[in-house]
Swiss-Prot record:
This is DNA polymerase. SMART domains: POLBc. PROSITE patterns: DNA_POLYMERASE_B (PS00116). It comes from Ictalurid herpesvirus 1 (strain Auburn) (IcHV-1). It catalyses: DNA(n) + a 2'-deoxyribonucleoside 5'-triphosphate = DNA(n+1) + diphosphate. Belongs to the DNA polymerase type-B family. InterPro entries: DNA-dir_DNA_pol_B, DNA-dir_DNA_pol_B_CS, DNA-dir_DNA_pol_B_multi_dom, DNA/RNA_pol_sf, DNA_pol_palm_dom_sf, DNA_pol_type-B, RNaseH-like_sf, RNaseH_sf. GO terms for cellular component: host cell nucleus. Its main location: host cell.
Length: 1512
């Protein structure tokens, strides 16, 4: 608590002393690195691990004589029961004190009682409430009785805060709180060097384990069935219950958490550990340890070269251990010696397995000869090993036993409760329908709980385990899959772009089906595995070094007064800090109560003044936007964004929204001398008040109103005040001091915003309801304004912000931004013309921004008065049973005090601490609203009318999310580069034949697309629109000069030459922070942007349809438990093994059978559709060229949204219902077209075409038949959009035709004539010359082929561990064969043509890229050579080599061919059956002489098999 708090004054002698120490003090400084509240015997204590900042010695303090408090109102002190209670209770200290009763809203005199233990406090409270209950009274505390179980509150109340510096004299005895000294200035001085303190007390390290993958490869000595049943009893119980419930008709059961790789016994074969030693000086501080189990190794380990991995072999300390037990022992001993912050990636596996193995060795219920592992390792040894682990997690395990909470364990416990609950419901004597309804409610409740479960939490003492998998889960690090390899590359490269490649990704993956063999073989094989294991630990530590989680952890502790408990997010939430949100607010509010003297009742609140609301939570107000693309070109205007600063936190302060300030409307007679805000006066309000002001009668003759405080407002204001102080200090500091202030100001912001998220239900309702009210009030005020003859209106609003267009200036004229050069023009004249034009263009930009800023300042001044008056007029004074309204006089709000008749000023005390204000955020000169919470804007931050910052703001657009798919990212980037940044299309001869390049990045020489003729405008209409095209222009020079009149400004002069006409010209561009501003003064510039985007869209349509887009963008990842067994079984047929993977990659085929049939051109009876047929392994699908679905409909949606309403047969053109002046506004017309003709979520191309088809003016001219003109505009817009969509679809279909000329092979499980998963080149159409191969729209096939060969050559060394190249032979073709290269491709790559997989990492981006380039190179050869393509001599059709099920549907000829193939297979030396089902079938029916008659019926010449299910 603060030193100026009343409570501190009362307890000063029992708390650490606030002092200002001199330099010659004999006290030593200690940094409290870990703090725990414990009970030691009969005493409560605070245990502190501390770093002596003078000596670097780490010590442990045990602090007793603590302070636990309870208060009894003085009016009850003489009650006999209370007197007896006081006499019989051990009380450490007693004192009178005046506090504020947060429940009854009044100040009261109390007696403060201090106890040495929490048990004594609780016993006193319980007994006191028993006595006072009949009298209508309560025992009170400062709120700690609701939150003291985690240790935060005892630590807070005794002022011994974690991660702060205290002074004391060291001793070995126990301490009392008052033996510590706190010097705030010195504490802050030390904390400014926090990065230097952390390594001295936090010894960081990272580890990773490797286990035996296949259960049948495990050491059978470790197979103890008694331990297995004990460990997985719950799993077996759940399986039995699930089966029983399904038989009883229960549906919709959520997936069981008793699945996954942790739900089995494991054998750890190696553990790698990297010890950072950041506290040491000099190079090579890190120590590398690798512990490995030699028990089953056939040969000693032989080291392999590691220099290419940037590793120094001499620094790696390998420790061979004779079995798993000794390996764990060596590992834990090293942890205890060198590490107290342990990083791991996916603790749910690594830590879970470590603890499983420790439980195995410490298993007490073992029986004689239950397993050899238990015979070899006595129980006492196992118990001692477990104790060592516990001593690592807590340096004082005898006083504080550490806890590790796993999300999966919580889920399992709750899942079992769900199943038990369902069982009890089924046993009830109710109707089946009633039971099923109850069961559904329980299932829904479980599903909601599942999303909020704490994922991982480490609660030790002097030790933290940090799971970097959760720490990395942030918006700024969105990765397609959460693997360590993917995340490490993303993060390390982001922070260290020049980091050596081997240091940012895992070692080349070792195939999971070979991993066990490598470990057992020993030699160089195990060396590979051990280095692989070590690199995983190194990646984890490198991620941690960049993200600095310990700094983040401690800064959050400093901000919110929490002790060190590392929680790792909940459910699927992104990481937002180690301290739980509830703790951030809870502890801060506790501190506010201690500082302000606010107390709370500890039992049922008697005489409560408010009843909690029960209606559902509300969200913020989101106004449906006026959708469409807009430019602030001549006669059009900027979109202004106004927002409330920290809206929710500031409203909580302004209106004092907190549980202890709420009073029901019918109970105001019990609250005197307060002024409350009447919540019933706003829409969707409540019959409640919050106390905002109180009457100060210090001078009885002159009462006045002052602000009333609450614990919430105090907590929030503290965060807001400290953030302001840190931001101010940040501007005046540098280096580590600046880092300190910057980190803390950001922490204060996060903690401030957290208050709303964890607020009580009634408070939450008040906050969001008031937020809606404010935004709607501002929007209504905007509608009352009329500027430059035009009425204003809001066009979008979201929660705390509103957007509107500032008044347009219809007198604005177009400016030319291009100078045509005459052949004989002198350099001096050219320079003069360009200089004059540049000045004119820049001045136009400045004039427009100045007008915008002038309007905004005037508007804000007016709206501030409206908002203030709206709040104050709803205040009511409670006095003498009356409810008195305020009134306004002379610009000030007053209320009359009924006791004295004095006018009391309401305005001054209310406004003095007012925080929530509407402010000018930015102005957008380009914007596109697509739907609610979905928009892109080119925003400019203005200061005194001048641009000081320009950037693109994006909200809710899929192209920037991890859910983006296919071409979405490319299309979004095209939109940004061409429409928002401003740029041109550069022509290349390569695969990416048209490439958007912003003007900021354009260089000479280059060929760009520009106008075939200059646009001519009249009354906002481009007269020559139909004749304008974009044609190549040669960029001969690009000159760049600074533009000092615009911050971040640049003038760019682009010299263009058009070869057909021979004309030369210079394009002048005004840039701000790399974004072109020419649209502000030139509609021609806008047209160029739009035509460029339409052109690239048409190019993308063919490009994406032809499958030229990076195929990694269509690879999905799914968690293994969510994948059906059929898919997992299918990929094992390719000899792929899932191993320890958390997620499996896949691509999807076309969904419709008819589409597949049309692509593969096979009889539909030959095509089967097994379960999960649509999912395919990425590598197999890409190399073998299955009919992959490129999701072209997704591309169409990115361009046009979900579909055009106006093309439906039932469509009727709607009436244009907007009337008045607004009906002529361009954005209103666009919104009408979008909503009624297009769809509710139309996208980029539709908006571009719409804007191009509209007049360039802000308003349709009213000197003609406006209604007819608007209808004509709408008709033209819709027609252009429809024509554009048809053209795009045609190009897409043409590209897709090319793609499916090659990607048309039928996957094995879909071909009922061939159940072998071997690669068959005879059905690969890419290996045969073809007729009618479509040509390219853009690009040179020869150049593209050469590019692909070059890129594949560069990839070959990087995929050497993934694929093997062999000479073509039918015998070498197997289920792991990927494809056969065309002869020319193989020659040009200098590799044999047959490509075979060596690896299970079939989602690897490089492998997929290699397959993609093979396809493109193959397609280019087909385009170049057609039927004359050079091919292989493949020989005759060969057999499958596998005895499988007979065809389900076939002709007589096909059945005969199948039996011939079967005969060849049976003639092999060792024929094999496809599966157990096939084997059983042939054993039963194979010798039947009437096989065909019994197995088949003939229907219309087609043989149909009678037995449907054979193959498993």
């Amino acid at each position: 608590m603060d030193r100026n708090a009343v409570l501190y004054g009362v307890l000063e002698h029992r708390l650490p002393k606030w002092v200002e120490l001199s330099d010659d003090t004999d006290l030593e400084p200690f940094f409290f690195s870990s703090v725990r509240y414990i009970t030691a015997g009969s005493e409560d204590a605070i245990m502190i691990q501390a770093l002596n900042l003078n000596t670097d010695e780490i010590v442990v303090f045990l602090v007793t004589n603590l302070n636990f408090m309870a208060l009894i109102p003085t009016v009850y002190i003489e009650n006999p029961g209370i007197r007896q209670l006081i006499a019989s209770t051990p009380i450490s200290y007693r004192s009178p004190i005046t506090v504020f009763n947060g429940d009854l809203k009044k100040w009261m005199d109390c007696d403060l009682f201090v106890f040495g233990t929490m048990a004594a406090q609780k016993a006193f409270i319980k007994a006191g409430n028993s006595v006072l209950g009949s009298l209508g009274g309560n025992v009170y505390t400062y709120g700690d009785h609701v939150s003291n179980f985690d240790g935060n509150t005892p630590v807070l109340q005794n002022n011994l805060m974690c991660s702060h510096v205290y002074y004391t004299r060291y001793k070995t005895d126990v301490y009392a709180p008052w033996e510590f000294y706190y010097d705030q200035k010195r504490d802050q001085g030390y904390l400014m060097s926090l990065p230097a303190i952390i390594p001295r007390c936090k010894r960081e390290g990272a580890f990773d384990i490797e286990t035996i993958v296949h259960e049948n490869a495990m050491d059978q000595d470790l197979n103890c069935q008694k331990f297995f049943k004990s460990e997985f009893r719950s799993m077996e119980e759940s399986q039995v219950l699930i089966q029983r419930f399904r038989e009883a008709g229960v549906t919709g059961l959520p997936p069981s958490p008793f699945v996954g790789i942790t739900q089995k016994l494991h054998e750890i074969v190696s553990i790698s550990l990297v010890v950072c030693n950041y506290h040491k000086t000099g190079p090579k501080k890190k120590e590398y340890y690798v512990y490995y189990n030699t028990k089953k190794m056939e040969n000693p380990m032989e080291m392999i070269p590691v220099e290419h991995l940037h590793l120094d072999a001499s620094r790696i300390k390998f420790e061979a251990c004779k079995n798993e037990f000794y390996m764990l022992l060596a590992f834990i001993n090293r942890l205890r010696k060198s590490v107290n912050v342990l990083y791991v990636y996916n603790a749910q596996f690594d830590i879970q397995v470590i603890q499983q193995r420790l439980r195995y060795y410490a298993f007490k219920q073992r029986a004689p000869r239950c397993c050899k592992g238990h015979d070899d390792i006595p129980h006492e040894w196992g118990k001692a090993l477990m104790e060592k682990w516990e001593a690592f997690l807590s340096v004082k395990p005898q006083l504080f036993k550490a806890q590790i909470l796993m999300g999966q364990d919580i889920l399992k416990a709750n899942y079992l409760k769900l199943l038990e609950g369902i069982g009890s419901v089924l046993a009830q004597a109710k109707s089946t329908m009633a039971k099923m309804c109850t069961i559904k409610e329980r299932i829904d409740s479980y599903r909601k709980m599942k999303d909020t479960v704490q994922n991982f939490k480490s609660h030790g003492f002097g030790c933290d385990i940090i799971d970097m998998m959760y720490v990395c889960k942030r918006k700024e690090f969105e990765a397609k899959d959460g693997s360590l390899n993917t995340v490490a590359q993303l993060i390390i490269k982001k922070f260290k772009p020049h980091k050596a490649t081997p240091k940012i990704h895992k070692m080349d993956d070792i195939t999971y089906d070979k991993l066990d063999g490598y470990y057992r073989a020993g030699g160089t094989k195990i060396a590979e595995c051990l280095i692989y294991n070590l690199i995983d630990s190194l990646l984890v530590i490198r991620i941690a070094k960049n993200l600095k989680p310990m700094e983040e952890y401690i800064y959050r502790q400093l901000a919110c007064y929490n002790i060190d408990t590392a929680a790792h997010t909940r459910g699927v939430m992104n990481f937002c800090g180690f301290i739980q949100s509830t703790k951030v607010v809870e502890v801060s509010r506790n501190k506010a109560r201690l500082d302000a003297g606010i107390v709370m009742a500890t039992d049922y609140i008697r005489n409560s003044l408010f009843t909690p609301e029960t209606i559902p939570r509300r969200g913020g107000f989101v106004m449906a936007p006026l959708t469409g693309l807009f430019f602030a070109r001549p006669t059009q205007c900027f979109e202004l964004c106004l927002d409330f600063t920290s809206m929710y936190p500031s409203m909580m302060c302004d209106l004092n929204i907190s549980p202890e300030t709420i009073v029901d409307s019918d109970k105001t007679n019990r609250v005197g001398d307060y002024m409350g805000y009447d919540w019933s006066k706003i829409d969707q309000g409540f019959e409640k008040f919050t106390l905002v002001l109180r009457v100060d009668r210090t001078d009885p003759e002159n009462p006045k109103l002052v602000r009333h405080t609450s614990d919430t407002s105090l907590s929030l204001k503290r965060y807001l005040r400290l953030r302001t102080e840190h931001k101010r200090a940040l501007k005046q500091s540098s280096g580590s001091v600046a880092e300190y202030h910057n980190r803390l100001q950001n922490e204060m912001k996060i903690c401030t915003n957290t208050h709303y998220g964890v607020s009580e239900h009634t408070c939450s309702l008040m906050i969001t309801t008031q937020g809606q009210h404010k935004i709607k009030l501002v929007n209504e005020f905007i509608k009352t304004l009329n500027r430059t003859g035009h009425s204003l209106f809001p066009n979008y609003g979201d929660t705390d912000s509103t957007m509107l267009y500032h008044p347009s200036d219809e007198s604005e004229t177009q400016l030319e931004d291009m100078v045509t050069l005459e052949d004989e023009m002198r350099a001096e004249l050219r320079e003069y013309m360009l200089k004059k034009l540049s000045a004119e263009l820049v001045n136009r930009v400045k004039e427009k921004t100045k007008r915008t800023d002038t309007f905004v300042q005037s508007f804000l001044s007016d709206v501030e008065t409206v908002l203030f008056d709206d709040m104050v007029e709803k205040l009511r004074l409670f006095s003498q049973g009356e409810v008195i309204e305020p009134f306004k006089d002379g610009g000030t709000w007053w209320v009359v005090d009924p006791l004295t008749g004095i006018w009391m000023d309401c305005s001054t005390p209310f406004s003095s601490e007012l925080i929530c204000k509407l402010e000018y955020e930015n102005a957008s000169s380009i914007g596109c609203h697509v739907a609610k919470k979905m928009y892109l804007s080119l925003v400019h931050e203005l200061n005194n009318g001048e641009i000081i910052n320009t950037k693109i703001k994006k909200r809710g657009m899929t192209g920037f999310k991890s859910s983006r798919f296919g071409a979405t990212e490319s299309i979004t980037n095209d939109f940004m580069d061409l429409i928002f940044n401003g740029g041109a299309l550069v022509k290349t001869g390569h695969l990416e034949a048209l490439k958007p390049v912003t003007w900021a990045k354009l260089s000479a020489p280059a060929d760009i697309l520009h106008f075939s003729e200059p646009p001519v405008y009249e009354n906002g209409i481009c007269l020559n629109m139909n004749s304008i095209t974009l044609i190549p222009h040669r960029v001969t020079a690009v000159t760049r000069l600074p533009c000092p009149d615009i911050k971040g400004g640049e003038l760019v002069y682009v010299d263009l030459h058009e070869s057909t006409s021979g004309k030369s010209s210079v394009l002048v561009l005004v840039l701000a922070d790399g974004c072109a501003l020419n649209h502000i003064f030139s509609s021609a510039n806008v047209l160029h942007r739009e035509l460029s985007f339409e052109t690239i869209a048409m190019f993308r349509a063919f490009f994406v349809g032809a499958g030229f887009l990076d195929p990694n963008s269509i690879v999905f990842y799914e968690r293994i438990p969510r994948l059906k067994p059929e898919f997992l079984s299918k990929i094992t047929n390719y000899e792929l093994f899932t191993g320890k993977k958390l997620k499996i990659p896949f691509v999807t085929l076309h969904k419709r059978k008819t589409t597949i049939q049309a692509i593969v051109k096979e009889d539909k009876k030959q095509i089967d559709y097994p379960e999960e047929w649509i999912k395919q392994d990425p590598a197999m699908a890409m190399f073998r060229r299955y009919p992959i679905d490129l999701r072209l409909e997704r591309m169409i949606m990115d361009y046009f949204g979900s579909g055009l309403k106006c093309t439906l047969a039932t469509f009727t053109p709607p009436k244009y219902t907007v009337s008045g002046e607004r009906s002529r506004h361009s954005i209103v017309i666009k919104n009408h077209v979008d909503k009624h003709y297009l769809n509710d979520n139309s996208k980029f191309l539709a908006h571009v075409v719409m804007d191009r088809a509209m007049p360039t003016t802000c308003y349709i001219h009213d000197d003609i038949d406006v209604k007819a003109m608007i209808q004509s505009v709408i008709s033209r817009v819709v027609r252009m959009i429809q024509d554009t969509q048809v053209r795009l679809q045609e190009l897409s279909a043409a590209g897709n035709k090319l793609f499916h000329m090659f990607f048309n092979q039928l996957p094995p499980e879909m071909n009922n004539l061939d159940i072998s998963f071997k690669y068959n080149p005879l059905v690969d159409h890419a290996l045969q010359g073809q007729k009618g191969v479509p040509g390219l729209q853009y690009g040179n096939p020869e150049q593209i082929y050469t590019d692909m060969i070059t890129e594949m050559t560069a990839l070959l060394p990087r995929i050497g561990h993934m694929v093997e190249f062999m000479e073509w032979s039918q015998e070498l073709s197997s289920s792991k064969t990927l494809c056969l290269l065309l002869p020319k491709i193989a020659r040009d790559l200098n590799v044999p043509p047959l490509v075979t997989s060596l690896n299970d990492d079939t989602g690897n981006a490089m492998l997929i890229a290699f397959a993609h380039k093979i396809y493109i190179a193959t397609a280019m050869l087909h385009i170049l050579h057609g039927e004359n393509l050079e091919t292989h001599d493949l020989g005759p059709q060969t057999g499958t080599g596998v005895v499988g099920e007979p065809p389900k549907h076939c002709t007589g000829a096909q059945l005969r061919e199948w039996f011939i193939d079967l005969q060849k297979t049976l003639a092999l030396d060792a024929p094999s059956t496809h599966c157990a089902g096939c084997a059983d079938f042939w054993l039963t029916h194979g010798s039947d002489p009437n096989f065909i008659e019994k197995m088949y019926r003939v229907n219309g010449g087609v043989f149909v098999r009678k037995i449907k299910k054979i193959c498993l």
